[in-house]
Amino acid sequence: MLAGVAAELPAAAQGAATTASVTVHPGILAFVNVTPTTTLSFPATTLNGTNQTVTAALVFDVADATGSGAGWNVSATSTPFTSGSHSLPDTATTIQSAPSLVCDILPIGCTLASTLIGYPYTLPAGSTPPSPTPIFDAAPGTGLGDQSFTTTWTLAIPANAVASATPYTSTWTFSLGSGP
């Protein structure tokens, strides 16, 4: 036995609880990175006596920072393709298959949209643009975060189209709304 030596036993470990909190406010639902583009050009076509189609891709970049999980939709309407007094049919523009999707911020930047839209889709057209119809949507619980979807548009040029030195043009209007 040692004389004059004191030994202390460590005190029992003491715990302290801390509560951490954060308030998460909803953000916006918006087109980002200036898409869709302001001009979409289909390739030039030489008439050959048969019905023809040409395609062009258009990228949409949608940010759903609302945190609601309500989903969203992109709708469209248009005027017919015209050149002077000549026009292509109102049903000339379609999307034949579902768009491709990609998260813009990886690795965990979004919940990819799951669309409820059936394809092919026909872009409504009229001299007075008809009511917009959805071209793509995000079902509830999907489409959160920043993502892009690429649509491949098909333009049908009938065999009886009138050739023109001036391009045929059409005005397309897109809108983004909450809910599918």
What spans do the regions from the language model cover?
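Sec-dependent, cleavable N-terminal signal peptides
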Residues: 1-14
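Signature of Gram-negative chaperone-usher
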Residues: 12-180
